[in-house]
């Protein structure tokens, strides 16, 4: 599904959202999935397709300047949240649930804080606050992106020899993620979106204030073996949810940072329970 949006300078561009193989239906509740740094909509394929065939609209976006979306790649969480609002407006969506992974979780959080009652559920997958990125990794993403990509994919996995459970026998989640990173990086010849995304994560400072402003239930999905955003790094957000009297739940899965592909069924089941889906 392509949506026509405008840049800050007033220029139009096409933004892409994967719909799970089902036509968008304004009557159905809408789920918006937001990817992380150097990813695209495809990281959610195992959750979005199921949910699209079980009563939901699915909009798994490519952030601007990533994958199939044009426009300027966002340089901050706040800028990316403006895209989410514009995308909802363009699609004619009055209310939606937001599900974000890693950098996408911060974008979802900031968007939920800004959009208030327009957001009905907020799921933060592989989240942390602050989401600091090591200086070495930021430097490598700028000057040696292939080296940085290998580093990220090593630290993002619970094991490099995981059982082929994601897409069936023969799946190599590490190799697939490396290929995805190369493809997304090559999709933007104007800007190093690897570096820009990491800087956006590292510089975001509004997490606690944003969480306090959220008006909907919150789900945290955390990887027990996550080395990029370990469960302890989400403690400040969870504590803020408790202190602020939010309705929230925490689900831990026995995998690393890419919960959607390393533990797809567990991640889907957590989302189904959160969304009160019984099927």
Model-derived features: positions:
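Catalytic histidine neighborhood in serine/cysteine hydrolases
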Residues: 235, 239-258
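Catalytic histidine-centered segment of alpha/beta-hydrolase-like enzymes
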Residues: 228, 255-268
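Conserved alpha/beta-hydrolase catalytic His-Asp/Glu region
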Residues: 139-213
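Active-site loop/oxyanion-hole signature of alpha/beta-hydrolase fold enzymes
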Residues: 6-21, 45-53, 57-103, 269
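Flexible "cap/lid" loop of the alpha/beta hydrolase fold
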Residues: 106-152
